[in-house]
């Protein structure tokens, strides 16, 4: 189901985190494209059709949930996974974002490799 041209967006202000996620994505059979802030991410959506997105919740320009809102306007069906150490799974903000469909899933930092692979298989391999 995954083709070598399918690309997953990673947005995190920590270059190391982008590198880690991009490597997991590549080893899962997809291409990864990274952005260090929301502005870069929005610019990347102009010329790319992403299969899914991993977003940090805290970015230097806007927060990850606001970026998710902007991405939703461009692609209502894009699977969006928030990856965060700031929020927890049972945080009301995250629960609301999941309930309303703003985000598709949540992964807490620090994460383990299998959590990311599982999200990729579930949401990008469609």
Ranges and model annotations:
Residues 83-85:
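Hydrophobic/aromatic residues positioned on beta-strands within the core alpha/beta folds
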Residues 15-33:
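Two-component/phosphorelay signaling modules centered on CheY-like receiver
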Residues 1-7, 112-126:
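Non-catalytic signal-transmission and effector/linker regions of two-component phosphorelay proteins
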Residues 48-54, 59:
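Active-site beta3 strand of CheY-like receiver
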């Amino acid at each position: 189901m995954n083709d070598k041209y399918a690309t997953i967006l990673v947005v995190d202000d920590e270059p190391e985190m982008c590198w880690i996620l991009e490597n997991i994505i590549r080893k899962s059979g997809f291409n990864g494209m990274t952005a260090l802030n929301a502005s870069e991410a929005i610019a990347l959506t102009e010329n790319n059709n992403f299969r899914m997105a991993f977003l940090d919740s805290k970015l230097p320009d806007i927060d990850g949930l606001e970026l998710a809102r902007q991405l939703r306007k461009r692609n209502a069906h894009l699977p969006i996974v928030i990856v965060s150490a700031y929020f927890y799974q049972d945080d009301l903000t995250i629960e609301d974002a999941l309930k309303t469909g703003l985000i598709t899933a949540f992964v807490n930092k620090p994460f383990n490799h299998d959590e990311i692979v599982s999200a990729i298989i579930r949401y990008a391999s469609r």
